[in-house]
From Swiss-Prot:
A Pfam family the protein falls into: DUF5907
Family: Belongs to the IIV-6 261R/396L/443R family.
The protein's name: Uncharacterized protein 261R
InterPro entries: DUF5907
């Protein structure tokens, strides 16, 4: 019999003879495990019981007693042994449950029967919070008065165990006269959020009204209205003196000026908090009066909380002591500040007092263009210019304002009148500048109709291309009038593609000797030296071979030695061994025969021998392969040698192997006796069980057990009998909440004064109290809000956070540092604290600027180079003055009369300047402000209140952010209200916010710190970093745009305070009159208004120009300079570059040539135009030039007869597309060759011929062939050539690039060669196209190839380009 040693897993069972056996790693134990258990278990034949099978059991562990009456051992029943809800009243013996038997949180109200838990049932200290689940102890489960202090474990009572307090916003504590626990209501200075946050209620803190010497509250009256956190200017409080002209725009409306009455109606209710179960009557008295219950700052455990500094208890009312308010601010500490000194406004939006900002408060350079009001910088505010007779403007290289000096043509009177200096206004014209001109030299006629003087127009005076046929008179152009040609030996004529005159170079067959043009075409045949072949006939099917300067020779075939490198490139990667082209390829063979007839070695490496027809059939199919010296057998997959299969003779399994059999498969064992490690049959196991006798279980041995005593149920599912579980059977903490019926422990089961701090469970975090929040009387954890702190068990007002540092959106303390100095009762601005960002755009007016403080450095850059500052002709307002015609500005700032534009080009109808129009708008007599000239930057933010807003002026941007609530809220009676119950009633009502509470625009209610009333101009108080202040409380700064005109004292802004470039046009005051400039007169450096004198004019758009009506330009004559008009033989647009008018020079004005039948051209040795005479081969018929010379043309028809597309001129050569050459002899065409078509490898040679497509066709299929393209040029030019070989034999019919090259070709007979081989053309049928492109001269040749099998071809192209 085969045996299996199951130590190694089987991996495959195919072909093993054991069908239906599979293995995996999850196999169940084999039967020998059962057998071994039977042999070793308890001396009997019954195996021990398991969770899935019956068996013997030992009276140990959780069992005791005897086998016929097993009992549960003491402490054997724990929480894990009890099913949820398994313990009911009938299952528990009276008095059997003690506290040690209950797991933490075990007993809930659902586990306790009504009245089942009395004081006698609860051991002292047995019930802790861990034993009672939240809400588990109901009144019906606990007898009245049954739970005393001794029955409640320390920390057992948490917020959820406390009964609802008598009302919302209450705490549990002892009052000031008794230590007994009771409900503590909140006084007016404390408040409770719905989330249970206890905080100070600032609205209930009474602070005396502020005075000029003390901190206190302020009333929103007089010029103030609104709320303390958002004070507004009262209606009518801002008059004309406070607003700049035209300052009120929609963007100037203060945010939030639209009230909440525009909110949609709806309703909001408070969220409800869950109710607790333990009331104040169940709490033990606190140790002393005026204490609370809560968690300290170091522990979350409930403890007595004493009141610290800032808090007091009156009766049951907890209040904040107002006497501990925040002290006044100093330069080193936060505190309150009084709105006096440099501050005014309100505490939430303090502003700078009028005239509080002097020059010492404004940092140097802080006043920029945006800080200066419009029309505030006059001559008195401008610093003296660097010298007399200067202006302020931008020079030609920069828009920055600078001093402009007067140049040539301008002058300044001592009264400030700028004039054109007539003596230098218009200088004499030069080749580079406009000016007056005299009718002399080349000009004559009159000023209104000047003409060219006789002989005044030479070659240099005529613009290239301006003289046409219509301009030339008959017989007027001679050789001396023609320009030099581009090279020697050239002619003037028209090319074949255009009638335009051009330089004609000499082609092949033409020469120039001196001035004589000759034809050098020889006789037929054309010799090689002249580009021909030297032959009159070429045999059909032959190839041309070069022979130097002698006539080419012909051959019927190409010798193999002429094909480079060989006829065959390679075979299977093997290249020829010699020039003969032989390739030695070793190939392997496959032979068959009997085993004994194997061929003798050596054999070629790779030869294969297969045994066939052998007398021994088992040998047939055996295969051997030779390695060159030995036959090696290819081994078959034989089952007897394969380790993957189980052998019938027996196999050893891999380690940790398991056998798994499907439900339809079986392992059948025929054994009758078994070793201890053998697998056994089911029959054997049954017989062993049936014949065996299992003894009764004892405490020391396994055995059978009877379901009696403490057990009942069935053998497969035993259970504990009813009433058998006593206290002695239950382990400590064995009863959890899951085992106790819900609702069994209630408030009536707890005795009075039995819940002390030791019985309360730890709170959820440190520094917490027990109480009811503002929306529900239910006891809950109360956290400390802002302004309260816990040190140990002492509750105090936290002075460091009672009043937080002021921010831009909230009240708070402020430190006299940064931009503030002085004292808390009289803060002032620090020196240099006012920068450009703190000054409101447009707030610095003329009264705020000191005299002589605005220099060039303080003026803003002008809008462009070469500009001035002045008033235009339509308005006295200062504006940028640009330079018009007749004026120019140097980079050094010198203003001059621009002679190039002083006298513009004349027209055909009038003398004078160009008329200006189109660029200006409006009228000079009625100037208006441009749209958008007054922006919001001229008005301080928040300067205009709601009463100043016209109907319809408020859009979406004027409504304060987040002021519109949801559509479901009904309108409350006022803003910043809640819906809730007040401190004396639980009825829902509108709750207003007092001091210390704020409502964000997003609807978030926050408790701010306790703080004194806002500061006023007469009393100390808190201040908010808003309005004119920003920064932080420890370093407040003046807010951007906080300093307006009202805050600046007169002459407070001096030169040091003005930033360079700060004074722009909008900051300059209007000039005394229109058409003025700002500059210094000829007698003083002081800036003053400059008026325009004669010769200058100012447009409404601010352009300064020369007034030509004041400049008289006389007409030019033959003896004097003056104006000229572009008529007669002159034209052009400017006087500096006159041109000859079209048609002014005609053929009649050209000189005659030296003789008849002549051309104008350049000779062979010179580019100078000269007369060209005709040679003997040229003739002239009237005005037609003839040349009876041969020329080469091409067509597209290779027929052997002369088709119509061929030219009919005598001695004409013609090349067909097949490479054939034809000559027309005057009567018909004579074919010189038969083309270059062949059925074999060819050599094509063409000399002295420029051709288009060269067609080379050979038949057959290319098999690893080479394609050699050899190109020669017999000129001295360098030809950049690109060669590519394309195959059109593709699956989709598209061209495939199968090789390319790029190479320069230069010099005479220097070749370009490209070899494609080694498979480029392997087995490619169809047409191949070789493309050669001469990139230098833009020529391209397409050579079409149909190759032959196993052969090479050679194409040689010789051409003159």
């Amino acid at each position: 019999m085969a045996s299996f040693n199951i130590e190694n897993p089987l991996q495959q069972l195919e072909q093993s003879g054991l069908a239906g056996v599979t293995l995996n790693d999850n196999a169940a134990p084999a039967a020998n495990v059962i057998y071994s258990s039977l042999k070793s278990g308890g001396g009997g034949s019954t195996p021990p019981a398991t969770t899935t099978s019956l068996g013997t059991i030992q009276l140990a562990g959780v069992l005791t007693g005897i086998a016929t009456s097993p009992q549960l051992a003491a402490g054997s029943v724990g929480a894990s042994q009890l099913a949820p809800g398994a313990v009911n009243a009938s299952s528990i013996a009276p008095g059997s449950i003690t506290g040690s038997s209950l797991a933490p949180g075990t007993i809930t109200s659902t586990q306790l029967a009504p009245g089942s838990v009395g004081s006698s049932q609860i051991a002292n200290g047995a019930v802790g919070s861990s034993q009672i689940a939240n809400g588990a102890v109901g009144s019906s489960q606990i007898a009245n008065g049954a739970v005393g202090a001794s029955q409640i474990a320390n920390g057992a009572i948490g917020p959820m165990q406390l009964a609802p307090l008598s009302g919302p916003s209450e705490l549990i504590g002892s009052n000031s006269t008794s230590p007994n626990a009771m409900d503590i209501t909140l006084g007016p200075s404390l408040q409770m959020s719905p989330a249970g946050v206890l905080s100070v209620n600032p609205s209930a803190v009474t602070v005396a009204p502020s005075t000029t010497t003390s901190l206190g509250t302020i009333q929103l009256a007089g010029v103030l209205t609104g709320t303390a956190t958002s004070p507004q200017l009262a209606a009518g409080s801002v008059g004309a003196s406070q607003l700049a002209p035209g300052a009120v725009t929609s963007s100037s409306i203060a945010p939030g000026s639209i009230s909440g009455s525009s909110l949609a109606p709806g309703s909001v209710t408070s969220s409800q908090l869950a109710a607790g179960s333990v009331g104040t009557s169940q709490l033990a008295p606190l140790p002393a009066p005026s204490e609370l219950l809560g968690s300290s700052s170091t522990s979350s455990a409930v403890t007595d909380i004493m009141l610290g500094s800032g808090l007091s208890m009156t009766g049951s009312v907890l209040s904040v002591n107002a006497s501990t308010a925040v002290p006044p601010a100093t330069s080193s500490s936060l505190g309150t500040v009084q709105l006096a000194g440099a501050l005014t406004g309100s505490a939430t939006a303090p502003s700078l007092a009028a005239n509080s900002v002097g020059s010492s408060q404004i940092s140097a350079g802080a006043v920029g263009a945006t800080q200066l009001g419009a029309n505030v910088v006059g001559n008195g505010q401008l610093a003296p210019l660097s010298g007399p007779s200067e202006l302020i403007g931008s020079n030609s290289s920069s828009p920055a304002a600078s001093n402009i000096t007067l140049g040539t043509g301008l002058s300044m009177s001592s009264g400030g009148v700028l004039s054109v200096n007539a003596s230098t206004a218009v200088p004499a014209a030069t080749s580079s500048s406009l000016g007056t001109i005299q009718l002399a030299g080349a000009l004559s006629g009159t000023a209104t109709s000047p003409t060219l003087s006789a002989g005044s127009v030479g070659a240099t005076q005529i613009v290239a291309g301006s003289v046409g046929a219509t301009q030339l008179g008959a017989n007027v152009v001679g050789n001396s009038q023609l320009a030099a040609l581009s090279g020697p030996s050239e002619l003037i004529g028209s090319a074949s593609g255009s009638s335009d005159a051009t330089n004609i170079i000499l082609g092949s067959g033409l020469t120039m000797t001196g001035n004589t043009l000759n034809s050098t075409l020889g006789t037929i045949p054309i010799p090689v030296s002249q580009g021909g072949t030297g032959l009159t006939t070429i045999p059909s099917g032959s190839f041309l071979l070069g022979n130097g300067t002698s006539p080419v020779t012909t051959a019927s075939s190409i010798p193999a030695t002429m094909v480079t490198p060989n006829l065959v490139g390679s075979v299977n990667g093997v290249v020829p061994s010699s020039a003969g082209g032989n390739v030695a390829v070793v190939l392997g063979n496959v032979t068959t025969g009997v085993l004994s007839a194997q061929p003798a070695q050596p054999q070629p490496n790779g030869n294969i021998y297969v045994v066939s027809g052998d007398p021994t059939p088992a040998n047939n199919g055996r295969t051997f392969i030779s390695n060159g010296t030995t036959w090696n057998e290819v081994t078959n997959n034989i089952a007897t040698t394969d380790a993957r299969y189980v052998q019938l003779a027996g196999s050893t399994m891999n380690a940790n192997a398991n056998l798994v059999f499907p439900s339809t498969g079986h392992v059948t064992l025929n054994q009758t006796t078994f070793a201890s490690t053998d697998a056994v049959t089911a029959q054997y196991v049954a017989s062993q069980i049936a014949s065996g006798s299992t003894p009764a279980a004892t405490t020391t041995s396994l055995g059978t057990i009877q379901l009696a005593g403490s057990l009942t149920g069935t053998a497969t599912s035993p259970s504990i009998a009813s009433g058998v579980v006593t206290q002695t059977n239950m382990a400590s903490n064995s009863i959890g909440s899951a085992q106790i019926i819900a609702g069994s422990v209630g408030a009536t089961q707890l005795g009075a004064n039995v819940v002390g701090t030791g019985q309360l469970a730890p709170l959820s975090a440190n520094s917490e109290l027990l109480g009811s929040n503002s929306s529900s009387p239910a006891a809950t954890n109360i956290t400390l809000g802002s302004g309260l702190s816990m040190t140990g068990s002492v509750l105090s007002v936290n002075a460091s956070t009672a009043v937080p540092a002021a921010t831009s959106s909230s009240l708070g303390t402020i430190q006299l540092a940064g931009a503030l100095t002085g004292s808390a009762t009289s803060p002032t601005l620090a020196t240099g604290s006012v920068g450009a960002t703190q000054i409101v755009a447009g707030s610095v007016g003329a009264t705020q600027l000191g005299a002589n403080v605005v220099g060039n450095g303080q003026l803003a850059p002008l809008s462009a180079p070469s500009e001035l500052i002045g008033s235009n002709s339509a308005s006295p307002n200062a504006t940028n003055i640009s330079l018009g015609s007749g004026l120019s500005m140097s980079s050094g700032g010198v203003l001059s009369v621009d002679a190039s534009t002083a006298v513009p080009a004349a027209t055909s109808s009038s003398l004078g300047t160009i008329q200006l129009s189109g660029a200006l708008s409006g009228s000079a007599t009625s100037p208006t402000l441009s749209a958008g000239s007054v922006g919001s930057t001229q008005i301080a933010d928040g300067a205009v209140g709601a009463s100043k807003i016209a109907n319809g002026a408020v859009g979406a941007t004027q409504i304060a952010a987040n002021s519109v609530g949801t559509g479901q809220l009904a309108a409350l009676s006022g803003t910043s209200q809640l819906i809730g119950s007040n401190s004396s009633s639980s009825a829902a009502t509108n709750i207003t916010l007092g001091t210390g509470l704020s409502m964000s625009s997003g609807g978030v209610l926050s408790a701010t710190a306790i703080a004194p009333a806002p500061a006023t101009s007469t009393s100390l108080g808190t201040i908010q970093l808003a309005g004119s202040l920003s920064g932080t409380a420890t370093a407040p700064t003046i807010a951007n745009n906080a300093i307006g005109t009202a805050q600046l004292a007169n002459n407070a802004v001096e030169t040091a305070q003005l930033a360079n470039g700060a004074v722009g046009l909008s900051q300059l005051a209007p000039l005394p009159a229109t058409s003025e400039l700002i500059g210094s007169s000829s007698g003083s450096t002081t800036a003053s208004a400059i008026t325009l004198g004669s010769g200058l004019v100012m447009s409404a758009g601010g352009q300064l120009s020369v007034n030509l009506t004041g400049v008289s330009i006389p007409a030019a004559t033959s003896s004097s300079l003056g104006g000229i008009q572009m008529l007669g033989d002159l034209t052009g647009s400017v006087a500096t570059a006159p041109t000859v008018a079209p048609g002014a020079i005609t053929l009649a004005k050209m000189a005659n040539l030296s003789g008849n039948s002549q051309l104008i051209g350049s000779s062979k040795t010179s580019t100078t135009p000269t007369n060209i005479t005709l040679g003997p081969s040229m003739s002239m018929t009237n005005s037609q030039l003839n040349g009876p010379i041969s020329f080469l043309t091409s067509g597209n028809n290779p027929n052997t007869t002369a088709p119509s597309d061929r030219p009919a001129q005598q001695n004409t050569l013609y090349s067909g597309t097949d490479g054939s050459i034809w000559l027309y002899n005057g009567t018909n065409y004579v074919k010189i060759n038969s083309g270059l078509t062949s059925t074999g490898s060819i050599v094509a040679s063409l000399t002295n011929i420029t051709f288009g497509n060269l067609v080379v066709q050979v038949g057959g299929i290319v098999n690893n062939a080479n394609c050699s393209i050899f190109v020669m040029f017999n000129d001295s030019q360098t030809h950049q050539c690109t060669a590519s070989l394309f195959s059109t034999y593709a699956a989709n019919g598209s061209a495939q690039n199968i090789g390319n090259m790029y190479q320069p070709i230069s010099g005479t007979f220097v070749g370009l060669q490209k070899v494609w081989g080694g498979g480029f053309l392997s087995q490619v049928g169809g047409m191949q196209t070789y493309v050669l492109i001469d990139q230098t001269f833009g020529k391209q040749w397409n050579i079409s190839i149909s190759a032959i099998a196993s052969n090479s071809f050679f194409v040689s192209v010789l051409s003159v380009i």
